[in-house]
Amino acid sequence: MTNKVNSYGWKALIGSAVGYGMDGFDLLILGFMLSAISADLNLTPAQGGSLVTWTLIGAVFGGILFGALSDKYGRVRVLTWTILLFAVFTGLCAIAQGYWDLLIYRTIAGIGLGGEFGIGMALAAEAWPARHRAKAASYVALGWQVGVLGAALLTPLLLPHIGWRGMFLVGIFPAFVAWFLRSHLHEPEIFTQKQTALSTQSSFTDKLRSFQLLIKDKATSKISLGIVVLTSVQNFGYYGIMIWLPNFLSKQLGFSLTKSGLWTAVTVCGMMAGIWIFGQLADRIGRKPSFLLFQLGAVISIVVYSQLTDPDIMLLAGAFLGMFVNGMLGGYGALMAEAYPTEARATAQNVLFNIGRAVGGFGPVVVGSVVLAYSFQTAIALLAIIYVIDMLATIFLIPELKGKALD
């Protein structure tokens, strides 16, 4: 494969990034709309929170299901299924009449969302040359942050005028854009070649092959364990910080809603910078050194941030915190693409990342418990420990795969 990125590579990347951006946009607008939905449908706080929980549960299930299907039937084909599933059931959310039908619609929409990350990462990795593979993964990862930023900017402007039902309809728009972009794509060459070679497989065992390849031998099992640790820390730290910090800044430091929103925007911009930098760095110095550098940066920035008390400094420092805590999101796509063969690549991306997402869901609970028992500063400082564990996993479990030819 040439080192030059062709037009197909760019189309595959943009189609993947828009889909992942839809994921971030959808989850954040749901958070913004919870109070309005709860008031309109007379939901309890527990019922309102469960709409988010079941969206994530659906995403985990969808990630595993569609990852395996895309390794068998194709990246582009299955991404079409996921986007249609999301669009239909997000549209149905706009006409929900009560808690139970809305919960069902959100869960099924979440199943559609779950396939976006892993399949999109696999598609971009297979469409881009090895020399630029980490950059491609980081650009797809940036899609999530662009979606989050778009939701943070649009929801306060539109929600008062069109209501939560209208916002669900707005949430379908990125899905149509992603569908249009993908409708002009064919399957990656490496996938079609591998599919032809495996076309004679039809037994039940062969259909489970993509899962078996994640633990096919000791070396691969070791990598899979390491990636689960990395993605768990990634999601645990992200949700632990992003769910609680705005609340802390508002209640303890008197940040207004506008200033809390500004902190979110500054922090997300830092995350975007970190993801971009990680992709550039990983293609230059390697995946493993880049992870270790950002993990060390996360430890230092978390410890320093936990000691800050000046509101203005905390506002600006959020960018550096976000850069190191979330910048590593730009590396998982390339790492997993290089660690697993074509017939298991999307399965690996979705299964391993969604296991991490499931573990990360406990982040807000753990941080909240420590806040109640001690203080917010203590809770944030303790998060540094998980990044030390992250470093150990990288050192002992993750090999350097920079430039590896995909098989």
Curated annotation (Swiss-Prot):
Keyword tags: Cell inner membrane, Cell membrane, Membrane, Transmembrane, Transmembrane helix, Transport
Main location, first listed in the record: membrane
Sequence ranges on the Cytoplasmic membrane side: 1-16, 70-77, 129-138, 182-224, 283-288, 334-357, 400-407
Highest rank taxon of the organism: Bacteria
Protein's GO biological process: carboxylic acid transport
One Gene Ontology cellular component annotation held by this UniProt entry: plasma membrane
Chain segments annotated as transmembrane: 17-37, 49-69, 78-98, 108-128, 139-159, 161-181, 225-245, 262-282, 289-309, 313-333, 358-378, 379-399
Membrane topology reported for the UniProt record: Multi-pass membrane protein
Residues exposed to the Periplasmic side: 38-48, 99-107, 160, 246-261, 310-312
InterPro entries: MFS, MFS_dom, MFS_trans_sf, Sugar_transporter_CS
A molecular function GO annotation: carboxylic acid transmembrane transporter activity
Cell compartments where the protein resides: Cell inner membrane
Family membership: Belongs to the major facilitator superfamily. Aromatic acid:H(+) symporter (AAHS) (TC 2.A.1.15) family.
Protein name: Putative metabolite transport protein HI_1104
Source organism (scientific name): Haemophilus influenzae (strain ATCC 51907 / DSM 11121 / KW20 / Rd)
